[in-house]
Amino acid sequence: MKALAKLERGPGLTLTRVKRPEVGHNDVLIKIRRTAICGTDIHIWKWDDWAQKTIPVPMHVGHEYVGEIVEMGQEVRGFAIGDRVSGEGHITCGFCRNCRAGRRHLCRNTVGVGVNREGAFAEYLAIPAFNAFKIPPEISDDLASIFDPFGNATHTALSFNLVGEDVLITGAGPIGIMAVAIAKHVGARNVVITDINDYRLELARKMGATRAVNVARESLRDVMADLHMTEGFDVGLEMSGVPSAFTSLLEAMNHGGKVALLGIPPAQTAIDWNQVIFKGLEIKGIYGREMFETWYKMVAMLQSGLDLSPIITHRFAADDYEQGFAAMLSGESGKVILDWTA
């Protein structure tokens, strides 16, 4: 089958032919329709320090997808041939304390599709049936293919009650932008997002941001004053991994505020702990998606009117993957879709 793989320990990916995956007793085989390019795939493309330490070579990558079940293992129940599915990209052990307690998103032995094992940038993907998630017919293939990052945004944004709250999001990547739409959809009052990328900030405005702030030109404090915010933000969502953004978020938080961290800062990032301690802030780390509560919430929000369509800005045939990666690398894109049926 055709697949997009890391064949050598260096930059780039190669469209190649690989063996179609075998299907275990508890697996489903998915014929891929659409995939989306993730920031993780960009790290793999660039072959940065993280990728060099993490990605086995050779291996085909990718973990954002939608497709159709074409084969099932003999033990699989609850699915049928022809079901349209996306899937949870974190394959968990099922035996650690958190897995046995139903907290699989906290599994200490997680294996990542397209990171630690063969991925979805291919004509077929085999995964445990437990990880597959049926997609309702009213949700398009394009939207279903971005459920993985949509899930990151949902898990982060809905970690705390947002109804009537003022929310600050630092980092206008696709996940941060989707978090804007989620926060507004569930009833946040002011949703402010910061970045230095004007293209991405304009996307955030299209997704409903109260203010999209280029912090290279505009003061967050001035924006807060314009919005008549006298006590700071109630909820902070750090999506950038940039230390200065995290610092500005902590400074802008109200006493008793709640902060969710999805962005990954450098390991030795220093912060002013006085901002955390004396403000009584609650800080929560976010990894992946809750299985499968996050997935149910994603579907429910789309069915109740959440519009994520502006975040999908580019579409290419899978054979034109280099154009897709170029769009992502340019910084002037939202989500980029690769069509495996073209």
Curated annotation (Swiss-Prot):
Binding annotation for Zn(2+) 2: C93, C96, C99, C107
Keywords: Cytoplasm, Metal-binding, NAD, Oxidoreductase, Zinc
Signal peptide: none
GO CC field: cytoplasm
EC identifiers of the protein: 1.1.1.103
Family matches, as InterPro entries: ADH-like_C, ADH-like_N, ADH_Zn_CS, GroES-like_sf, L-Threonine_3-DHase, NAD(P)-bd_dom_sf, PKS_ER, Zn_alcohol_dh
GO BP, one annotated term: L-threonine catabolic process to glycine
Catalytic machinery residues: T40, H43
Binding locations of NAD(+): I175, D195, R200, L262, G263, I264, I286, Y287
Pathway, per record: Amino-acid degradation; L-threonine degradation via oxydo-reductase pathway; glycine from L-threonine: step 1/2
Origin superkingdom: Bacteria
Record's catalysed reaction(s): L-threonine + NAD(+) = (2S)-2-amino-3-oxobutanoate + NADH + H(+)
Any matching Pfam family: ADH_N
Binding site for Zn(2+) 1: C38, H63, E64
UniProt cross-references to PROSITE patterns, sorted A to Z: ADH_ZINC
Cellular localization per UniProt: Cytoplasm
Main location: cytoplasm
Complexes and interactors: Homotetramer.
The protein's role, per its UniProt record: Catalyzes the NAD(+)-dependent oxidation of L-threonine to 2-amino-3-ketobutyrate.
Family note: Belongs to the zinc-containing alcohol dehydrogenase family.
Protein name according to UniProt: L-threonine 3-dehydrogenase
